[in-house]
């Protein structure tokens, strides 16, 4: 493969979540935005490209048809909704039980044989390996040895699969079990054993990894030396047509040194940390009037527990829970916020932080992995460590009492975001696809 046009068909696997679902609800978040935006940008760059996206049909809102053409891109972007009835009520961590069914359906429902499969998250990564075994048996009968589809043993080098593969596989983890467990905070569950097992095996079966930051790449190579030279670092982008400052539009309490509205946007769950913000508000000096808007839903009892805790702390009138909103409305909320807070225990990048900065918002974020790259400390936002309510209270008070600092951080952040586009992300991703060794195909295919 020597030019972007050499890759004609890409299959994107996102087993556990629909990339085109509303971010901030259920399992939909930054990964969904990343996939949807990069796919659309790739289609713009390469007019010959066709993309098929595969996801489980897990919600009542999913189309009843097995596949739908995208309203904007038509047959160039087809969304496949794989129906595995038993998986509809399963939690994300229980979906591994249905990997084989999902992988088989990805092959049987495909409209074209892919040149590349790009799998997102550990479930999809293993589904891609299993699907490659199905493609291999279909395209090259009798040629697939034990272990080529992940079913047997491997020495970790990947030589078995790479010598017999039917398609090139690229994998973006978005998170890893090892990283999440190492950074998890109090009350956050450990990752399931099967996830650790699969993520330890994946390096032997994929052509390459695509990650967001140098830290992510470094940690992967430390855990899996065989990945050295097979990891590409591609920074996510931001849609600055939507997420941008507007002339004459200012935060709600633009010049106040005592009043402030904080916005948290994302799925409310322990690892995202909105509970830290509730606890921090209770520690602020009494002369400060600080409100917190939590934008998102997690389909659990976590939100109710947040509201109950706020009431216990006397903050019932200061903490509000709101439904997730479309990008245009989210951008409006960011522009009106005095502070946007991202108190996660771990993020591979932190798209919410980047989108908020693109709107000119002052951002507070945990000083952890990917957020260190999304936010330039003391220039486009402030990083908070350690990840405690006490430290977050100190950081919030600092920004509330310094409107000039909020203005400076927001201006620098908006300027930086203008240089980070999804077009750049997509172009680099297409270049990585081209590094795969082409697979000779039988003449009849």
Range-by-range predicted roles:
Residues 260, 264-283, 304, 390:
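A conserved mid-protein helix/loop that constitutes part of the nucleotide-sugar donor-binding site
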Residues 215, 237:
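Carbohydrate-associated surface elements
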Residues 324-325, 332-337:
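Short alpha-helical donor nucleotide-sugar binding micro-motif in glycosyltransferases
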Residues 377-378, 382-389, 398-404:
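Conserved acidic donor-binding segment of nucleotide-sugar-dependent glycosyltransferases
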Residues 345:
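Aromatic "clamp/platform" in nucleotide-sugar-dependent glycosyltransferases that forms part
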Residues 291-307:
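Glycosyltransferase donor-sugar binding loop
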Residues 1-70:
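N-terminal subdomain of nucleotide-sugar transferases
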Residues 362-365, 375:
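Short hydrophobic beta-strand element within catalytic cores of glycosyltransferases
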């Amino acid at each position: 493969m020597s030019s972007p046009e050499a890759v004609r068909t890409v299959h994107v696997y996102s087993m556990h979540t629909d990339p085109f679902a509303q971010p901030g609800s259920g399992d939909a978040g930054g990964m969904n935005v990343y996939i949807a935006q990069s796919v659309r940008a790739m289609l713009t760059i390469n007019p010959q490209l066709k993309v098929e996206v595969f996801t489980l049909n897990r919600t009542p809102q999913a189309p009843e048809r097995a596949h739908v053409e995208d309203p904007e891109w038509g047959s160039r972007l087809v969304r496949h909704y794989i129906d595995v009835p038993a998986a509809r009520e399963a939690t994300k961590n229980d979906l591994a039980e249905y990997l084989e069914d999902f992988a088989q359906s990805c092959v049987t429902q495909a409209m074209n044989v892919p040149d590349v499969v790009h799998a997102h998250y550990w479930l999809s990564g293993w589904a891609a390996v299993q699907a490659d075994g199905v493609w291999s048996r279909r395209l090259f009968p009798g040629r697939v040895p034990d272990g080529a589809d992940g079913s047997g043993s491997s020495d970790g080098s990947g030589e078995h699969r790479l010598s017999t593969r039917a398609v090139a596989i690229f994998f973006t983890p978005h998170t890893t079990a090892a990283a999440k467990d190492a950074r998890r905070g109090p009350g956050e569950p450990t990752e399931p054993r099967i996830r650790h097992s699969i993520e330890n095996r994946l390096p032997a079966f994929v052509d390459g990894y695509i990650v967001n930051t140098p830290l992510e790449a470094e940690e992967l190579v430390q855990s899996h030396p065989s990945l050295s030279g097979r990891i590409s670092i591609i920074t996510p982008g931001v849609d600055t047509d939507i997420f941008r400052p507007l002339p004459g539009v200012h935060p709600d309490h633009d010049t106040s040194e005592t009043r402030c509205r904080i916005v948290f946007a994302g799925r409310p769950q322990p690892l995202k940390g909105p509970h830290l913000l509730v606890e921090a508000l209770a520690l602020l000096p009494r002369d400060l009037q600080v409100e917190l808007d939590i934008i998102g839903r997690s389909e659990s009892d976590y939100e109710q527990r947040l509201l109950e805790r706020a009431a216990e702390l006397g903050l019932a009138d200061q903490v509000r829970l709101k439904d997730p909103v479309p990008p245009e409305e989210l951008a409006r909320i960011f522009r009106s916020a005095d502070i946007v807070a991202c108190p996660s225990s771990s993020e591979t990048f932190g798209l919410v932080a980047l989108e908020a900065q693109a709107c000119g918002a002052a951002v507070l974020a945990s000083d952890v992995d990917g957020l260190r790259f999304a936010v330039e400390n003391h220039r486009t936002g402030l990083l908070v460590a350690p990840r405690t309510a006490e430290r977050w209270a100190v950081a919030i008070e600092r920004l509330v009492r310094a409107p000039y600092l909020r203005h400076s951080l927001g201006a620098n952040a908006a300027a930086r975001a203008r240089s980070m586009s999804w077009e750049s992300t997509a172009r680099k991703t297409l270049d990585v696809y081209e590094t795969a060794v082409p697979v000779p195909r039988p003449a009849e295919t």
